[in-house]
């Protein structure tokens, strides 16, 4: 299984609407990727205002191939939604779940 973590740095003076991210943006991702290997998603919100990331979205896929096919098919529409909830540039980590 593959986990794609999209991490939004906690940058002073930047905007991040966690409610939009957790509902509308993640909803859009599910709409586009549920039939393309997306198994589930999680949204983490920083518990401490000084945390290095304000929020992290985790997307779980059956395989790297399914992630790549689904993501690249719908990347333009999903990334076009980012300005609706933030002006932070996200960092991405793709991991293979070992255990």
Where would I find each of the regions flagged by the language model?
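Macromolecular interaction modules
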Residues: 1-99
């Amino acid at each position: 299984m593959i986990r794609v973590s999209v991490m939004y740095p906690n940058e002073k003076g930047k905007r991040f609407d966690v409610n939009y991210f957790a509902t509308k943006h993640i909803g859009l991702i599910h709409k586009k990727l549920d039939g393309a290997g997306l198994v589930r998603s999680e949204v983490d919100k920083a518990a401490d205002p000084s945390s290095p990331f304000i929020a992290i979205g985790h997307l779980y896929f059956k395989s790297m191939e399914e992630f790549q096919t689904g993501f690249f098919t719908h990347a333009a529409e999903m990334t076009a939604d980012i300005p609706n909830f933030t002006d932070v540039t996200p960092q991405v980590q793709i991991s293979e779940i070992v255990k």
